A protein has these predicted regions:
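Flexible glycine-/small-residue-rich
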Residues: 18, 44, 75, 125-127
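Short alpha-helix capping/helix-loop boundary micro-motifs
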Residues: 44, 89-92
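Conserved beta-strand positions that form and line the central face of beta-propeller blades
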Residues: 41, 72, 82-85, 106, ...
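Zn2+-dependent peptidoglycan hydrolase active-site motif and core
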Residues: 53-88
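Conserved, short, structured surface segments that act as functional micro-motifs
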Residues: 96-144
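Short acidic/polar mixed-charge low-complexity motifs
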Residues: 48, 77-79, 130
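Surface-exposed, glycine-biased beta-strand/turn segments
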Residues: 1-67, 100
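Residue-level recognition of beta-strand microenvironments
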Residues: 19, 61-62, 86, 107-110
């Protein structure tokens, strides 16, 4: 029997307010439409520090039209973490090496597509280019 995989620490403290939904549709009040959701939204106050969930290299830092200020970090085992809705001017640059727990940025309000939701981090995880449910890899807080 294979040993259980140890889950990583979450990028930010808070409860998931929007779950991963690639096989079903969620209703976006902001966009007034049904849509899939390739990540999770973790409720956290604006300005809260966001930390790397695993060691890796910063692949991109950019502003996405829908998800706002975004940082992508790729691990050596082909996992890509996408941290979005960050505050402007994250402290990391493309090519930077990060360890698990290093500062990626802070929660912002730059995601136009999710501005109707409470303050949160939008977090996506990909394995070999395919979106995977972050809750299978990260130990997030559960609703009380």
């Amino acid at each position: 029997k294979a040993p259980a995989r140890t889950k990583a620490s979450p990028p930010v403290s808070g409860e998931i307010i929007w779950g991963f939904a690639m096989d079903s549709l969620l209703y976006s009040r902001t966009l007034n439409q049904w849509m899939t959701h390739a990540g999770v939204d973790v409720a956290s106050p604006k300005g809260t520090e966001v930390h790397a969930v695993f060691a890796g290299t910063v692949q991109a830092v950019y502003t996405d039209d829908a998800l706002g200020v975004t940082v992508e970090v790729e691990s050596k085992d082909n996992m890509l973490a996408v941290y979005a809705n960050l505050a402007a001017e994250p402290p990391v640059r493309e090519g930077a090496r990060l360890n698990a727990g290093d500062l990626v940025g802070t929660v912002g309000d730059t995601a136009i597509s999710e501005c109707g939701d409470k303050s949160h981090l939008h977090f996506e995880l990909y394995r070999s280019g395919t979106p995977v449910n972050p809750e299978e890899y990260i130990l997030f807080e559960k609703a009380q």
